[in-house]
Amino acid sequence: VIAFFDASALIYLIEGKEPFASRVRNQISEVTQAHPNMRAAVSRLFWLECRVDPMKNNDAATLALFDAFFTRPDLVWVELNQAVVELAAAIRVRHGLRTPDALQAASCLQLGSRHLLLSSDAAFQRVHGLNVTVLS
């Protein structure tokens, strides 16, 4: 199983925003117990979203924490290629997701059926084929 992270989940974890960070950590632990060989995946959009606030605030320490996560050798990257963008457009039309969310959903679907989308946004559940775990 490949766990695809939406930006909010990782931002809560890396930045340690409580009580959200503890909740996300606990839910990820539960998912990991159910899928012990789980790998992590992200999109380039996710990379951008996670870096914006630390860069805007000149927060080198937080940026370094994100960069440490993004340089993990076991991390699976989903690039924003033509197939992803075309699928995102269809998802946006069918399900009314905002463009960034449609891009995330389309990116996750590139991973095949053995994926979990970890997000705090329940709107992803509207997308057929997405295996969503809503992080509360």
Regions found by a protein language model. Give the residues of each.
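Active-site neighborhoods of divalent-metal-dependent phosphate/nucleic-acid chemistry enzymes
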Residues: 75-120
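An alpha-helix initiation/capping motif
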Residues: 44-45, 82
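Conserved N-terminal glycine/acidic-rich loop preference
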Residues: 66-69, 74-86, 96, 125-136
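Short, well-structured N-terminal submotif of metal-dependent ribonuclease cores
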Residues: 1-42, 54-68
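Short, flexible helix/strand-to-coil boundary loops that buttress conserved ligand/catalytic motifs
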Residues: 14, 54, 92, 128-131
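Acidic, PIN/NYN-like endoribonuclease modules and their adjacent C-terminal/linker elements
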Residues: 2, 105-136
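A generic structural signal for short hydrophobic patches within well-formed alpha-helices
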Residues: 10, 47, 124-125
